[in-house]
Amino acid sequence: MKKNNKLIDVPNINSSEARVKKLIYKVEDNLFNSLYKSSSKSEYLCICSGGTTSSCARDGLITLDLRKEYNQIHLEKERNLIKIGGGVIMKDLMNFLENHNKTFPIGLSKLTGAGYVLTGGISPLSRRYGLAIDNIESIKGYLGNGKFISLKKNNLNSDQKLIWEGLKGAAPFLAIITEIGLKTFQSYPIQIVEGFINDDELSMIINLAEEFPNNLSLQWIYAEGIYIYVFAEIKNDLDQEITKQYFKKFEKFTSLKIKNYENYNQINFFPKELELFELNKNNHSEVISLLGGDLKNNIQSFVKCMKEIIHDKPNRSCYVASQQLGGKIKEYDPKSSFFIHRKSTWKPWIYAAWKKNDTKERESVLNWMYESWEKLKIYFPKIHLAQIHNHLNSHEEEVYLSFGERLGELKTLKNICDPESILPPL
């Protein structure tokens, strides 16, 4: 059999080195026909919107790369609405919005694509503006059965309502999304307190953060050291006063510094210059994202647990980081989307990396990831399915912990929208 050399140029190293069966760039009718006739039921279509996940390309499978043909951006300024193609990366969206003094709650990375939005979308701005999916106004694309859809939030019939909810949080299992209409927001200045801290200081800062107003949020990384960002949006004089009061509490942490930014787009979180962890372009990696509520009286035991996890990490490239939820996110009806864990306060994620082609290290690193997840379950029992791991043994458990009591509905939706399972399996 002839060796297949088709490669896809994406940020994720696992995917960029996958020997894909075929690369396609546009959704056409014959795409669905050929997939329906596929002789192997283990085959499915991989979708690349930004290329930051390990599931956007797999050996021997077809990848649909949306970045070339679906990269349009159109702002309807009078409606505070922006329409983006399914292949637009967040960096391009934010650069475009910055030129119009607008913003959107993107995450800590600007490399992600529309998949970030469709799987939930947790941002430092989410405590004030909700998740990315909470700000979707319209969706266009193709269900797995080949049917074209054009849905508008305020014009849904009873049949479309469940599909709309499913696409907000579980789209990768149901459809190929080619356009999303998003609500945009006026851009405001940002103040950040950032710096390296120790274990005891992390405990104190998490305790402070669980009382934050909605314009503040905490993000941290625990790698070779601990680095934090306390993020504050300054919309008006009241924000300024509240932020000043809270930032005063951080003066006792002498390693922390205040930085000012004109807008959210100017911030670069966890830059490589800080050397927080070893960034190796020859590494393969996996990420698992957890969800849980306030830590409250468990903060110190959690930080102790984190210290043990980091002590046991198999190399300098692995780490654990976290974002803060809450605020506006909790106000939405859990049934408004398939991101059901609305009461969550924290989203930690475990980043596990190993040298490519080193099967022994891969096994060791994945064992560390699963053992760390097991230790953290007591604090963060749920999952945010930001990456699909149907190539790993944990996939079914991740799906269950992500969709919970709505998993039955999702399976029904899957049977309706993607009966031949041409998209990733549940």
Put a short name on every predicted segment.
Residues 1-426:
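Soluble FAD-dependent oxygen oxidases
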